[in-house]
Amino acid sequence: MQTLGLSGESRRSDGRLKSIFWPTVENAWDVNYLGQQGFWICVVLAAIQLVVAAFSSNLVVLAAYLAAGLVYLMGGMGVRESSWPAAAIVFGIFFTGLLYTVMMGHLPGIVDVVITCILLSNVRAAFLASEWKPAGEGEDRPTRFSETMMDKFVDQLPAKLWPKIQPFFFAVAAALFALELFGAGAVAWHRSSGLVVAPHP
């Protein structure tokens, strides 16, 4: 069974909901499934950033959303290849954006909170996958398919690109994370100094 490239479900240890919010890794199928799942989560986030950017007339905002979309997409490739640092920085960028919203005096929406929890769970999944070792050399493992465009996108592209784009990803992601952290810190400092008036309800 294959849904959006999420294959090997019959041998997974967890149900779908648990794998999203509290994943565990007991075999190679768990590693493969969680990598695919984390990849799609990041791809969806990247698509959202691009949609928002498409409707923005402010060049600074446009550039910020395009950069975030690129980082989420590349980070998804890292997650597919069991890179927990990639998952961690994707979570950090999204969480810092949420923190900025709070600092501006707005409560985050339910969807934002759920996405934050999923991204944090993504870090756990990537870490567990990176630490998992097969019991033996000949242990059965899921196949990475390449028959369809979806297979190539989910199973083949991350494996080919991630080793090459890692330095670029971490450089861009670190810069974006630092800018967001600086922005949230600046807003917090101004608010504590009384220089920013809280919005009226």
Spans of model-derived segments:
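Topology signature of small-to-medium multi-pass alpha-helical membrane proteins
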Residues: Q2-H200
